[in-house]
Design a protein with these regions (language model features):
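Hydrophobic packing positions in regular secondary-structure scaffolds
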Residues: 1-265
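Extended alpha-helical regions
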Residues: 155-158, 433, 437-440
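Intrinsic disorder/low-complexity signal
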Residues: 40, 431-432
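Alpha-helical transmembrane segments and their membrane-interface boundaries
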Residues: 258-396, 400-404, 408-422, 426-431, ...
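Mid-bilayer segments of alpha-helical transmembrane spans in multi-pass integral membrane proteins
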Residues: 112, 124, 399-404, 434
């Protein structure tokens, strides 16, 4: 495979400009579909359409699958429904085809489905479209090798050969009974190495790991991670085999989930990228910035209440960034750890008290170390015992409070069915800033009121 480089990109653009379809086709033939998709994503609509038309139908389907979702939608809007059905969808796996069709307007969906030549494929796609895209049923594919438990191994091999052209990879053969209920699996190695006279029921692996069609993506990801499998069958409520999810589909979902959580942790309210228009980017970024602004206003009002303290002890203003920043960092660390455990499913109800207690113990150690370091610093540079005590004691309390809130808030959000990933972002930072300033001012005022 030829790797996409800046030099190759320049060559490909030259072939497009000079209408050299032969060289463009020859170069595309030696490239991976992912690299072709990356190249086409950056082209104008007209050039992208021309580039796709020089590809064989099978490779067009692979390239379309790998393209950026928004860019794919733009390009497909220029392609007739019949062409989408016969040249693209027909050469896709059912799960990829369902994802593509689901992303289009409803009237285009019906037109494309009506033009798919393979009625069985069209029916399978319609079945997948009925599932929520964030469930196991929404990401499974229908392409798989299914055999009856009463068949012989030669019959199993014949079925594998018959379906081989429709499958990119064959990980397992799925064994069902007469009612289509999944009762076992056959790894490909077992099919190859067992004597040809064996009956399937005697060599299959019974009670395989399964997913249900209504399982959430979190459950799907957790199951793949827990059992370290490359493919897991999906069944309905009656145990009937409905499809299979492969590891490549899960990796795609994990990447999308990670990107979404990273954006939420950064204070973005929706999935955006640099190619989105100004209004969409503004709408995604502005809400949390406005909330942060309101938090800052409350913070300034809070500090204004203690203006008499600043008048008496101007030095304490030097440590406001230290108090606020340390509290925010500690809260972010604690919330991130809890959110990760919740995402992995390793934090159940029984472990919550122990987790909070463990986090508080860690916070006590961190608070003690930070407070002592700041106390030593102030001893040499500030030389005011009350300032030293006020800053160090405030840091100690703020670190413990921030750690507690960072652990508890994601748990509370998870309990009320709000994505706890949001708690790792500006929400924790704003709250810790307010708490930090209140603690700092209260302790400072109390110490100076008592000792001076």
């Amino acid at each position: 495979m030829i790797e996409l480089t800046p030099e190759l990109t320049k060559e490909l653009r030259h072939y497009l400009e000079t209408n050299d379809a032969a060289k463009l086709q020859r170069t595309f033939h030696a490239m991976h579909p992912t690299d072709i998709a990356t190249f086409i994503d950056d082209l104008s609509d007209e050039d992208a359409t021309r580039a796709l038309r020089v590809l064989p139908d099978v490779k067009v389907a692979d390239v379309i699958t790998e393209m950026d979702q928004d860019r794919r939608r733009e390009i497909l809007s220029l392609v007739p429904e019949q062409e989408i059905a016969t040249k693209i969808v027909q050469n896709m796996d059912t799960d990829d085809a369902a994802d593509l069709i689901r992303d289009l307007r409803s009237e285009r969906q019906d037109a494309i489905l009506a033009h798919i030549p393979d009625l069985e494929q069209a029916g399978n796609i319609v079945d997948l479209l009925h599932y929520d895209e964030d469930t196991a049923g929404g990401v499974m594919r229908k392409e798989m090798i299914v055999v009856n438990a009463n068949w012989s191994m030669p019959m199993c091999l014949d079925e594998m050969r018959r379906q081989a052209e429709e499958l990119d990879e064959i990980y397992y053969v799925y064994v069902v009974d007469d009612l289509k209920r999944l009762i076992g699996i056959l790894p490909t190695k077992t099919v190859i190495t067992n004597p040809s006279i064996s009956e399937i029921r005697y060599v299959m692996l019974p009670n395989p790991v399964i997913l249900h069609e209504s399982d959430s993506m979190d459950t799907v990801i957790k199951t793949f991670d827990q059992y370290d499998l490359v493919a897991i069958p999906v069944v309905d409520a009656l145990g009937r085999l409905k499809g299979v999810i492969t590891i490549d589909d899960v990796v795609d979902e994990m990447r999308e989930k990670h990107e979404a959580e990273s954006q939420m942790a950064s204070g973005l309210s929706s999935d955006i990228d640099t190619s989105d228009n100004i209004f969409k980017q503004t709408g995604a970024r502005l809400p949390w910035l406005l909330i942060g602004m309101i938090g800052g206003i409350f913070n300034s009002q809070l500090l204004g209440i203690y203006d008499s303290v600043f008048a008496m002890i101007p030095q304490i203003s030097l440590f406001i960034p230290l108090i606020g920043g340390t509290g925010g960092n500690v809260g972010m660390q604690s919330s991130t750890i809890v959110v990760q455990d919740l995402a992995r499913g390793t934090l159940d109800l029984k472990r919550i008290p122990r987790t909070i207690l463990n986090d508080l113990c860690v916070a006590l150690v961190i608070a003690s170390v930070i407070s002592m370091v700041v106390f030593v610093y102030n001893y040499f540079y500030i030389k005011d015992m009350l300032v030293m005590a006020s800053v160090s004691l405030s840091l100690f309390v703020v670190v413990i409070c921030a750690s507690l809130f960072g652990s508890v808030i994601p748990l509370l959000m998870n309990a009320v069915k709000i994505d706890p990933a949001r708690a790792t972002g500006p929400f924790i930072t704003i709250l810790d800033d307010l708490i930090g300033m209140f603690v700092y001012m209260t302790i400072t005022q109390a110490l100076y009121g008592h000792f001076r």
